A protein has these predicted regions:
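Hydrophobic h-region of N-terminal signal peptides that target proteins for export
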Residues: 1-5
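Short loop/turn segments immediately following beta-strands, especially the blade-tip
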Residues: 127-130
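Aromatic (Trp/Tyr/Phe) and Gly/Pro-enriched flexible surface segments
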Residues: 6-98, 107-108, 115-120, 132-219
């Protein structure tokens, strides 16, 4: 029985940082987070000296943080076959317990782009997924959704899933692991090729043990 909730994600709100972002791809500024492949996620924070990497307005459209002052941004899908996909990965406070259920939740907001996805994914692993020289990671994953397309650009949307641990998992990776995605077109009159993608802001990631699947509820 779970006696109390404990978020196993370190720096779950991306507030702990080693500096303020000044350019794209500076995900390493968010402490405890890294990229498992050739992708370069973006870190946005209120403290950025440039408008492009602030929060409310930035190079990807912008959003006020769900909490605190910072969040991550990842490119999850695109129509440019030569471009890569972005993921964020972290190690957990402690390994997962075999057969324990875990509630996985995070908040997403769609950036300025033409397409949206129906879900994102989470992968738990015993060892880190790192230095993968691939543009897209295809792995079995835990779907994270709220039952509708993730197309809201005005506010944060909570998405979730329940994971039954194999035991010993120490790492969490977030992104798009689907081999064949189903796109949702959210714009139809934009000819800018940079918008032919699905780009998501991510904030407030939680992994908490629960006794039952019904114990994993959406958060405001």
């Amino acid at each position: 029985m779970v006696l109390f909730s404990q978020n196993l994600v370190i720096n779950s709100d991306f507030e702990a940082k080693s500096g303020c972002p000044t350019a794209s791809g500076q995900f390493v500024l968010a402490e405890e987070w890294f990229s498992p492949n050739v992708g370069t996620p973006d870190y946005f924070n209120d403290c950025s000296p440039t408008l492009e990497y602030g929060t409310e307005f930035n190079s990807r459209g912008g959003q006020i943080p769900h909490s605190g002052h910072g969040y991550m941004g990842i490119l999850c899908e695109n129509l440019h076959k030569n471009q890569f996909f972005e993921y964020i990965e972290t190690h957990l406070k402690e390994p997962l317990t075999k057969d324990q259920l875990y509630c996985v939740k995070l908040f997403v907001s769609l950036g300025d782009c033409d397409f949206a996805l129906n879900e994102l994914g989470a992968v738990f692993s015993e060892t880190a997924l790192k230095d993968l020289q691939v543009k897209k990671i295809i792995l079995p994953f835990l779907p994270l959704s709220n039952g509708t397309p993730l197309e809201d650009t005005e506010k944060w949307i909570c998405i979730k899933g329940v994971y039954k641990a194999k035991g010993g998992e120490r790492y969490l990776t977030i992104g798009d692991f689907e081999k064949d995605d189903i796109f949702v077109r959210v714009r139809t009159n934009n000819n800018d090729p940079s918008f032919k993608s699905a780009y998501y802001f991510i904030d407030d990631v939680t992994v908490e043990p629960v006794d039952y699947e019904s114990g994993c509820q959406y958060s405001p």
